[in-house]
Amino acid sequence: MASGARRQVDTAMDDSAIILNYTKIRDNLIVVHALTRAYGRKSFLVKTGAKAKMAYYLPLNILELSITENTKSDLWYASPLAAKYPLLGIRNNVFKNTMSLFMAEVVYRTIKDGAQEDGLFDWCVRQILTLDALQADFSNYHIYFLLEFCIALGFRPEATDMIPFTGEYQPFVEQFMRSDLPTAMLIPLSGRVRSEIASSIIRYLEFHTESTINIRSLQVLHELFA
């Protein structure tokens, strides 16, 4: 080794992460797409195997990760240390579980890899724990989540701003905008109207983020709550 040359050493650290999705690379390797407290939206290489708990990587799981910086790539390594919350209220309820898929996909497709939004991680944790704890009717929760997500990203919806996107459903949207969470959950809507309102807010998100946000799980949610 030349005089004065230094060997680069990978740096290890722990961080909290919300699982959004994962991509299988081969039998013992996946890429986990996550929202982290320290690094924002980031993807990690994670080794799996016969003893690996794939349940760790369910959408919206909140994990403590051991992260190793990869000096040769932007794709760092990670391994799970523990799940921070059991989220049994979500995992034991097919309706909540489907809603968690939708929420994770919205964040995954809206926040680009490498992006950091101040306070977004903690905001998402609160939304996840709220869904987990809800006992009464929560079939409107994804609409409430979408409107609050807009605010978390810094573009608070105004009633007049929403009209080009919501059309005939504007009165319902305004009702949500005036309501706290318990009241919003009681707004009577058909499954079709819920789906149309959610689609209109996603179009509003697309306009403000200047991107296409194709949420595939919205149709599943519509069928489940029809």
Region spans (language model):
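Non-catalytic alpha-helical scaffolds and adjoining flexible linkers that form interface surfaces
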Residues: 2-30, 35-226
